[in-house]
Regions:
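Sec-dependent, cleavable N-terminal signal peptides
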Residues: 1-28
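Surface-exposed extracytoplasmic segments
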Residues: 28-240
Length: 240
C-alpha cells in the first residue's frame, strides 16, 4: 500500500449485496467502474478498475484495504452500548461478542483511494452481507488515527479533526442510495455534503453531483467466494 492513502477505514454499520460509492467532483476520466458489478471486463464495462483488480493487484489505486474477510460465525465481535456511535468519540465506543442479525452481518468489505492529476482525492468502497433481504445501512469511517478493538470491550485510538464518515441508506429493497457525508471537527460530527438519492449512471458520477452509489439489480458474478444465508458458498452475488 502506498503511503499517500493515510485514512484507515473502519466499518461501523451495515450494507447490502454489492455496493460502491465515490466522493469527488464529477469528471470524465473516472478511475473506477461504478457499474453495479465487481468484474472489470464485463461486456459494456466503463473504463477504470473494478473490485476484482483492486482487491488483488491494486490496479491504479494509491492505496487499498484489500478484501477484508469476516465470515459469518456463531460468535462475532459487534458494537454494543445502544444508540448511534457516530456522535461519540472513539474512547466511548464499546464492543462485545455476539451474533448480529443476518441482514446486518458483513462477510466482506473493501476500499480504495485514487488521486487525480488535478489532486482530486477519490474514495471508493463497498461490502457484501450474509443476507440481502431487508433494509440496511452502509457506514464507513475514514480515520486518521489507528483504531482497533482491545481487550475489555473498548477501542484504541481517538477521533481527529478531519475524520470522515459516509452513511448510505438503502430502504425498501431499492437500488438507489441516500448518501450523507460528515466530518469530525471540534469534538463533533458535522454534515459536509448530502448527495440525496443519487445513483451512479453509466459507470460514472452524474453531472453536477459529488457522490453516488449503486448496487446490483440482478444476480452478478462474484470475483471471490461469497457466503449467502440461503445458498451457502457461491460465486454469485444475489440482487440487492
Amino acid at each position: 500500500m502506498k503511503n499517500k492513502f493515510n485514512y484507515k477505514p473502519l466499518l461501523t454499520a451495515l450494507c447490502l449485496g454489492l455496493a460502491a460509492l465515490i466522493s469527488a467532483p464529477a469528471f470524465a476520466d473516472n478511475p473506477f467502474q461504478l457499474d453495479g458489478n465487481a468484474i472489470s471486463n464485463e461486456v459494456g464495462h466503463p473504463a477504470g478498475d473494478d473490485w476484482d483488480v483492486v482487491n488483488t493487484t491494486g490496479g491504479n489505486s494509491e492505496g487499498r484495504t484489500g478484501l477484508v474477510i469476516d465470515r459469518p460465525e456463531p460468535t462475532q465481535s459487534i458494537f454494543t452500548g445502544g444508540g448511534a456511535k457516530d456522535q461519540m468519540d472513539i474512547t466511548a465506543w464499546k464492543w462485545r461478542t455476539g451474533t448480529p442479525p443476518s441482514k446486518d452481518d458483513l462477510t466482506h468489505a473493501y476500499a480504495a483511494a485514487y488521486v487525480q492529476d488535478n489532486n482530486d482525492f477519490i474514495l471508493v468502497f463497498g461490502m457484501d452481507r450474509y443476507d440481502t433481504s431487508g433494509d440496511a445501512q452502509l457506514g464507513f469511517w475514514f480515520l486518521k488515527d489507528e483504531v482497533q478493538p482491545v481487550t475489555g470491550g473498548t477501542f484504541s485510538g481517538k477521533h481527529q479533526d478531519g475524520d470522515v464518515l459516509v452513511l448510505v441508506n438503502f430502504s425498501n429493497g431499492g437500488s438507489v442510495p441516500t448518501i450523507n457525508v460528515f466530518q469530525w471537527q471540534g469534538g463533533q460530527v458535522n454534515a459536509v455534503g448530502t448527495g440525496g438519492a443519487v445513483k451512479c449512471t453509466n459507470g460514472y458520477i452524474p453531472a453536477g453531483q459529488n457522490f453516488c452509489g449503486i448496487t446490483n439489480a440482478i444476480a452478478v458474478k462474484a470475483p471471490w467466494t461469497y457466503e449467502n444465508k440461503d445458498v451457502g458458498l457461491t460465486d454469485m452475488f444475489p440482487p440487492g
